[in-house]
Amino acid sequence: MMGEFKHPPQEKQKMSSTKKAGYSNPAFAAMGIPALRLPGPKWCAFWLVVGAGIAGVVYDKREQRRICKHYSSLVKDQGAAHMDTWLKPRRLTVFVAPPPGDYLETSMKVWRRYVKQVLFEAGLDYEVFTEERQGVIRHEVAERVRQLRRDIAAAEAAEQRALDEKRWLNRMRSWWRREKLSEEELERIRAQKFRDEFTYKQLLGVFYKNAPLREQKVWDADALVEDPVLAGGVICIGRGAYKEYIAGIHEGTLGPLDPPTLTPEAPTELSAAAEDLTQAPEQPEPSAAAEALKQAPEQAEHSPAEPDSAATDAPDEKSNNAPAPPPAPYVSPDEYSSLSLSQELVGDVRHPSSHIPALFHQPLLVIPVPNLSGFLQTPRKIYRFYTRRYYAEECCKAAAAMVLQTIRPFQPDDLNLGISEEEDWPRRWVEQGRERKSEWVQDLKADPRVIAELHVVDPALMADLAATMNLN
């Protein structure tokens, strides 16, 4: 056909191989800005994956902040309520234990990020007890109960002694047998009385030169409640802390006040069982013979006459630096049924001086700490990392339930509180714990007489409480 121009095959191939020019504004081209082109498929896929990952993290973090703010707003009215100067706020006791094979900081993050914020907004006071070694929380709880028993017994003995002194015959005897004290003894008694009665309110603050306000006694809010269940509270962060708390309550209420005598073989077994299993296994240390061979040339150069002094001092330094194992339990779980409940702990038990209800009367809250370990658990770790908001809501809701006191009696099934955490425990750690008779891997046992005094905080009752608040 006339007028039709056909390109040679070589020129067609060159035109097809050249890339199409992107969009370019004439003004941009005049300024030297290159043409805008869309990235290739590979770059699009890369930025899509990176953007989705970052967006998932940002969304999850934002939801966590929203959840914490929501549950903090539910208890904010209690923190803004009026409180007298002579009244101390409600006080909680928090026991924190690390997950197996990890550090204590893992559990402390749960406390700081989710639980502490809600308690702070509610205006509650708290005491945090942390420990990495197994058995220390159990001993601490048992010792608090035993000390309460000692104080109650001492108060009863002092009351009986005061009643005996009021009798006229005893007063005549004391007057007849009394001895005249020297001036030094009287001065010592006056000094001790001054130290016992001295407070900084006599010198500082608004109490200075204000006798009525200074003499006013300060009371704990927990001591003024009629029902001991509504006083204070106990929070166990971690399944291990909960197991030790239950064991410590049984040991303190059923066991003796003084430690039992142990056989010579028992301390070795108990120290091995109480060894810290929460940390990763340490590297094997070189033997004493290898250390002696390694230090032999240096000792020959510096002090050839005393080659054994350094070798004998090294074990002593190591033994002094090593922490002592926690004391062994006074009673074993198999002995619960054969032991009698202490007479001091019958009925409404309160401290003689502070009038605060006993620890086992206060409501209990358990917060599990899920923690996966191992390379094969990577997919589950990634899923939990992007869905942390669900765990945050569980923790914040439980903390709000503790503040609002949604309490119910303790049931035998409540021994399984936080048992889902044990599914994440490393198998190797569990096997080693069974060989060493660890407290955490043993079945949790309880006595009906002890758990009858316990109460738990149930976050599931929050819905009923919210409905009641809406109706009112």
Curated annotation (Swiss-Prot):
For this protein, the record's Pfam families field holds: Tim54 (PF11711)
Residue ranges that the UniProt entry lists as topological domain Mitochondrial matrix: 1-37
This protein's source sits in the domain of life called Eukaryota
Q: Where is this region: Disordered?
A: 1-20, 276-336
Topology of the protein relative to the lipid bilayer: Single-pass membrane protein
InterPro entries on file: Lipid_Phosphate_FormReg (IPR050187), Mt_import_IM_translocase_Tim54 (IPR021056)
User: From start to end residue, where is composition biased (Low complexity)?
Assistant: 279-292
A molecular function (GO) term: protein transmembrane transporter activity
Annotated GO biological processes are:
protein insertion into mitochondrial inner membrane
Q: What is the annotated localization of this protein?
A: Mitochondrion inner membrane
Regions of compositional bias (Basic and acidic residues) in chain numbering: 1-14
Q: Does the keyword Transmembrane apply?
A: yes
Topological domains, Mitochondrial intermembrane = 59-472
Q: Does the keyword Iron apply?
A: no
Give the transmembrane ranges.
38-58
Gene Ontology annotations for the cellular component aspect, listed alphabetically: cytoplasm; intracellular membrane-bounded organelle; membrane; TIM22 mitochondrial import inner membrane insertion complex
UniProt KW keywords: Membrane, Mitochondrion, Mitochondrion inner membrane, Protein transport, Translocation, Transmembrane, Transmembrane helix, Transport
Per the record, the similarity remark reads: Belongs to the TIM54 family.
Q: What does this protein do?
A: Essential component of the TIM22 complex, a complex that mediates the import and insertion of multi-pass transmembrane proteins into the mitochondrial inner membrane. The TIM22 complex forms a twin-pore translocase that uses the membrane potential as external driving force.
Q: How does it assemble?
A: Component of the TIM22 complex, whose core is composed of TIM22 and TIM54, associated with the 70 kDa heterohexamer composed of TIM9 and TIM10 (or TIM8 and TIM13).
Would you tell me the protein name for this molecule? Mitochondrial import inner membrane translocase subunit TIM54
Source species, please? Eremothecium gossypii (strain ATCC 10895 / CBS 109.51 / FGSC 9923 / NRRL Y-1056)
The root-end lineage is:
Eukaryota, Fungi, Dikarya, Ascomycota, Saccharomycotina
